[in-house]
Amino acid sequence: MGHQEELKPEQVDLKVTPFVGYLRRTWSDFCATSSIHGLKYTRDEDTNKIVHLVWLLISVVMFICAVVMARTFYMDYRSSPTRMNVESDNTPVNRLYFPPVTICPDVLFNMQKSEAFLNTLRLPKGAELRGILRKLHIFYGFMLDDERYSAEDIEQMEALLFLNNLTIPEFVEHLRWNCDEILYRCRFNGEIMDCSKIFQLSKTFFGHCCSFNLRQKGWVNNKLNNLESFKVFHLNSLNFTAQRAIGGLRYGLSVVVRYKDDNYDPLQSYSYGVKLLIQEADAFPSAHSAAKFIAFNSETFAAVRPQETFCSSAVKALIIEERNCVFQNEFPMRYFSDYVYPNCELNCRVTNMVKFCGCHTYFFDFNRTSDRICTFRDIPCLVDNFANIITRKKSTQCYCPLTCEHIDYDVQLTNFPLELNMPVADKFYSGLAKNDGVLHVFINSFSYRRLRRDLLSNMVTLVSNLGSAFSLFVGMSMLSVVEIIYYFSVILRKNYKLECETRSQMLHKKPKFAWPKANDTHSKEQKSVFIIHKS
C-alpha cells in the first residue's frame, strides 16, 4: 500500500508536532506510490536533497502549466461555446417566406396632394402656399443632420399646426404617398394582381413606404377623406401575407413604379427613382436593411440570395450568457415588439431621442408608450444631438445581443434601359409610360444555404480537454484524483492514529530520573549524578 501499519519509536520525530509528523508521513507515502509523474523522485532515498528540490520544482512548474492550459480550454469554452456549421447548401427555398420587400419614394411627400390639402388650411399671417410647400423639406430634420433650419421657418410651421388644430402624425397623413400613388402594376408568382392586395402602407426610417410580406405590429391607418373624421386605429399588426418563396424570375415579385403626382419634378426634388429595402419580416425597414436605389426609365432585376441561421437543440438549452445570443421573446424592448438585431439598434436610437429631446419622431410611433411625438420645435434638438442619438459615441450605445436565428439577404442588381415600345406578349408590360420604372425581385436559386449554430464542445469534450492538459504535463488522470482523495482522507487518518499511538507508547516507556539525597556523598567534590531505577 506504500504506508506502514505500525511505527517504530525511532521513526517518530519528537521535535515536530503530531500534525506535522503524520502529514509529512502521508506525503511521503503518496509520493512513493502515486501515479503522478515525478513525485516519487522528490522522496527518493538514493538521492540527495538537491535532487529532491529540483524534482519538486519541476513538478510544480509542470502542474502550473497544466492549470494554465486547462484554464485556457475552459475560458475558450465559456467565451465562444458555439460554432457555425453548414447544415446544407441545397435546402429547398420554398421552406422560406418570400423576402419582405419595401418600396419607398425618394421624396417624402406627394406635392400635388400636399398642395391640395394645404389649400384647405388656414395659413399663418404673412405665409404663402408656395412658401409652405418649400418649407416641407424641414421634415428631413426628423431623420438627418445635413441642414440647420431657421427659427422663423420652424415657428411658421408650428403656427400652421396650431391654427388648424393638427398634430404632426395627422399632418403627415394628408401629405404622404399612398401605395396606389407609387405602384402602378404588380405581379406575383406569374399572376398580375391589384397592388393593394399584397402591398400595404408601412412606417420606415425613411417615412411612410409600401411593404410586401412585412410584419409590422402596432398600427394601421383608417383612410378617410376629410380632416374632421381623421383617426388612426391602433390594431394588432400589418397584415402579413405569408407568401412562400419559389426560385426563379417567373415566381418572383414584379412591380411597375409610377409617381402619381403632376407636380413631381425630378430636378427640383433631386430624385429620379425609389428605394428598395429588403430585410427580415419582423425588422423595421431602415438603413440596416439591404437598400438599393431603383431608377426610373430602367428595368431592374434584383436577385436575392437568402441564408438562414438556426440553432440546434443543444444550443437552445444553453442559458443566454453561454450561447451569447437571444431569441425573439428573450429580450424585451420598449419601442418594438419583436427582437431582431436592427430593431434593438433602432430602439436604442429612440431611447436616446427621448433622453436628449424628450420625444421621438412620428415614424417610430407604434402606440407602445405614452412618450411625446416630436414637433417642429424639437428639430434643432434632434439635429444638435444627432451624433448622440445614432450612437456614434460609445457612452450612448446600448447592449444589443445577436439573434440566435435569423435570415440574411444578399441582393444583386442588374438594370437595363426601359424600352417602351418593345413588342412583347406579356401583358405586364402594356401601358408603360415615360419615367416608369420596372422592378423584378426574385430568388436566384431553387435552394439556399442553411447554417446551424451548434456547440463548439460539450461537457464531455471539455472534460476530455482538461484531462489531456493534466495528462500531458503531470501524467494525471481521474484515477490520480481518486488516489489524492484516498491518501489525504483514509491514509491520512491511519497515519494520524499511528502517530498518536506511537507517541503515547513512547511516553509510557520513558526512563525515570531522580536526584541523589543531600547526605549522600560519593566524592569530595560536589557532583550531580543520576540514579536510574529499573522498573
Curated annotation (Swiss-Prot):
In which tissues has expression of this protein been reported? Embryonic and larval tracheal system; dorsal trunk (but not at fusion with transverse connective), several branches and terminal cells. Also expressed in adult tracheal system; dorsal trunk, but not at the spiracles.
Biological process annotations from GO: intestinal stem cell homeostasis; intracellular water homeostasis; liquid clearance, open tracheal system; sodium ion transmembrane transport; sodium ion transport
Task: Give coiled-coil spans as residue ranges.
Answer: none
Bilayer topology reads: Multi-pass membrane protein
User: Could you tell me which residue ranges are on the Cytoplasmic side of the membrane?
Assistant: 1-49, 493-535
Ranges in the topological domain labelled Extracellular: 71-471
Q: Which GO terms describe its molecular function?
A: ligand-gated sodium channel activity; sodium channel activity; sodium ion transmembrane transporter activity
Family assignment from sequence similarity: Belongs to the amiloride-sensitive sodium channel (TC 1.A.6) family.
This chain belongs to the protein called: Sodium channel protein Nach
Q: Which organism is it from?
A: Drosophila melanogaster (Fruit fly)
